[in-house]
Amino acid sequence: MASDLSKKRKFKDSKGSKPERALASSSKAKKLKRAPTPEDSDAERDNSSDPEIENQEPEVEVPGPPQDNSEDQEAEENANAFERQDEPAGLDSAIQKGDGSLLGPSVSTDAQAFSELNLSDKTMMSINEMGFTKMTEIQRRGIPPLLAGKDVLGAAKTGSGKTLAFLIPAIEMLNSLRFKPRNGTGVIVVTPTRELALQIFGVARELMKNHSQTYGVVIGGANIRAEEDKLGKGVNLLIATPGRLLDHLRRGSFVFKNLKSLIIDEADRILEVGFEDEMRHIVKILPKENRQTMLFSATQTTKVEDLARISLRPGPLYINVDEEKQFSTVEGLDQGYVIVDADKRFLLLFSFLKKMAKKKIIVFLSSCNSVKYYSELLQYIDLQVLDLHGKQKQQKRTNTFFEFCNAKQGTLICTDVAARGLDIPQVDWIVQFDPPDDPRDYIHRVGRTARGNNTKGRSLLFLQPCELGFLAHLKAAKVPVVEYDFPKNKILNVQSQLEKLIGSNYYLNQSAKDGYRSYLHAYASHSLRSVFDVQKLDMVKVAKGFGFSTPPRVDITLGAGMSRDKKPQARRAYGSQPRQSGHQRR
């Protein structure tokens, strides 16, 4: 609340950098319909807890929002996710001779600009059209060895520009080997979420607009038969989520014997959301001979090391651009927290959003039902917001994502489905209304702002007095936060009106109960239970934050039985999926 919140050093209501150029709008985006699967990175637990476990960092345009076409056009819309261009006149034999390295003069490891990389004219033309000249650190250190055909294990903060770091060498390889559609797939990019896959697809489209190779995306929620048809015609660069990729590999939907490059993006997140078995099967199925592998992960866990061991060739190059940094979050990010009682949390949030109405803000909550309730409540009282969570159908999620990307101001209420990798331009504020599950999630949430070089952003964390122990965990993770204070008389006290509204409006009352229940389930399943102990909550105050004068009856033992760092054992088999049947996700 810049002017209203005064920290022990003031909020600065800086204007930040100028808005990026308008995001491209594509008429070729898809209508996505399918029952939710574990590929919704915010996979949630039925009945027990509602928290989401949910997305690189391309600092470029992303494909525009899909058109809301009729059901009978679904296959055609999904087919348009693939771009096909004129075939090159190259020799098929070039595919078999390639060893993954690129021909031409060697590249200086001291290169600072893209023009120093000896890239093809077609790629350089695209990079120039996208407005890039100088490389980020991960690009400077990663692209030259990747162009030389080396395997790379990379670690970099969100917003570091690693999408270009892995796409440029992959596209150069396809170009140098003169891949044709009939040669099948030469590059596969695996990413944890549908939104991130669509975003990487948008970056690939920009980079490949002057090339003759084909490219496409396959994700859960899309029409699998339409995907099969396009894959059968030849997709040289394929972007996929793990479950859908394994589907197509097992179905024999496409030619992958000529695969030269496997890219695993956000490897730690892929494994966190339960795709360990799928990734092992994928790596086992794909050809290993002459295959270059690029594995990027924000954190180096034991599972990531195991995946690297089975997927990379011996002696990969390890690149960590963050190990010597003083802080775990990016420069230009002003981070603070406020201490607020549970019954004042919504009042403070409402006052903040009213004050910052002309800013672009993302508000993170811990559960889908809480997002649904608060977004409905805010819109009911004439504060327009967008909402994004894993209970929504894919079409709705995709439309909301692109609408917020293109907006110059506004508020997005969301779960952690939006916390990882997604590049949303010019976000001014990150508000963590519900604290994250651990410091890593905090870092990824605040990574939605201050993205790229010389950009500014601000974040605000809400903490109740009983949650102050979380600050020690942030300090241990090298996250610098300072306390923000706020004048009590500046908070809009609408509590009595809120309770009256919830008591008289049946629809909002039911939504509030669902949100309250899900909040407590999420809290009870928190991985840092020494800090976030549901038994220490003042239930009367928590209930007031949802608009109740007295707490509704809720059984919180379900959430307490499962920590969010544990994954459900039962998984639906991939392949034929049931039709969407409404509310299946919590």
From Swiss-Prot:
Record's GO cellular component terms: nuclear envelope; nucleolus; preribosome, large subunit precursor; small-subunit processome
Enzyme Commission no: 3.6.4.13
Motif Q motif in this chain: 112-140
UniProt catalytic activity: ATP + H2O = ADP + phosphate + H(+)
Location of the Helicase ATP-binding domain: 143-318
Enzyme class of the recorded protein, top EC level: hydrolase
Domain notes: The Q motif is unique to and characteristic of the DEAD box family of RNA helicases and controls ATP binding and hydrolysis.
Protein known as: ATP-dependent RNA helicase HAS1
Gene encoding the protein: HAS1
